[in-house]
A protein has these predicted regions:
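Helix-to-loop junction immediately C-terminal to a conserved catalytic motif
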Residues: 11
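Conserved ABC transporter NBD signature motif
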Residues: 19-27, 36
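Conserved catalytic motifs of ABC-family nucleotide-binding domains
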Residues: 47-68
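ABC-fold ATPase nucleotide-binding domain signature/coupling loops
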Residues: 73, 83-115, 208-211
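A short, proline-enriched helix->beta-strand linker immediately N-terminal to the Walker B motif
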Residues: 122-126, 155
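Catalytic Walker B motif of ABC-type/P-loop ATPase nucleotide-binding domains
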Residues: 128-132
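Helix N-cap at the start of a conserved alpha-helix in ABC-type nucleotide-binding domains
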Residues: 139-141
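C-terminal portion of ABC ATPase nucleotide-binding domains
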Residues: 147, 154, 169-211
Length: 211
């Protein structure tokens, strides 16, 4: 608990009751929030489904001022395993209307999550947050997308919030929270050696895959 609240504090969506939030050594309370938001990208667990909009607009809405090309949209979709040429799901390609309105295409929960992730790929922010947006996506596909995000985040800052510890392994720094407090931090290997909360959760999850 407390992980989503922490991510929203870091984005400046919440104001801390005590203490301060700094990014690059600067207190966010004295930072131009418009500038901060333009440099920040986030995909939350409770993402918005933009119905009555085309597939293309669903991706572009994350960065409306970015120069539009069909190739950029198609790339973001393909990195999240969505194919604009899938005639069954997207009969009009990038111009397919989504949602029940206007006889649009109705996506599954996993497809909506992939689309939300595609918006994150398209935005190309300096500071990215992924707050468990992949609960309806299988672990292997989730791991692939997170690793791709890690590539995009090279030289930038990315925060991934997840309960699937297999995905946490790709991080160069893991922070473990329990009851709203930070209880451990380190790399995957360091935390396993310490035999603390992280190691306990890792072993519990791993046991579910051992026959």
């Amino acid at each position: 608990s407390g992980k989503t609240t922490l991510s929203k504090l870091l984005m400046g969506l919440y104001v801390p009751e005590k203490g301060s939030v700094t990014i690059g050594g600067r207190d966010t309370s004295t930072t131009d929030m418009t500038s901060l938001m333009k440099r920040t990208g986030a995909v939350f667990q409770n993402f918005i489904k933009y119905t009555a909009m085309t597939l293309s607009d669903n991706v572009r809405i994350s960065s409306a001022d970015k120069k539009y090309t069909p190739e950029n949209i198609s790339y973001a979709l393909s990195e999240c395993s969505l194919d604009k040429n899938d005639e069954k799901t997207f009969p009009e390609g990038l111009e397919t209307m989504l949602g029940r309105e206007f006889n649009g295409s109705e996506l599954s929960g996993g497809q909506w999550q992939r689309l939300a992730m595609a918006r994150g790929f398209y935005r190309e922010s300096d500071w990215m947050i992924l707050d468990e947006p992949t609960s309806a996506i299988d672990p292997l596909e989730e791991d692939r997308m997170y690793r791709k995000f890690a590539e995009l985040a090279n030289g930038k800052t990315a925060l991934i919030i997840t309960h699937r510890l297999g995905s946490a392994r790709i991080a160069n720094r893991i922070i473990v929270m329990d009851s709203g407090r930070i209880v451990e931090e380190g790399t995957h290997d360091e935390l396993l050696v310490r035999k603390g909360k992280y190691a306990e959760m890792w072993e519990a999850q791993a046991s579910g895959y051992v026959i």
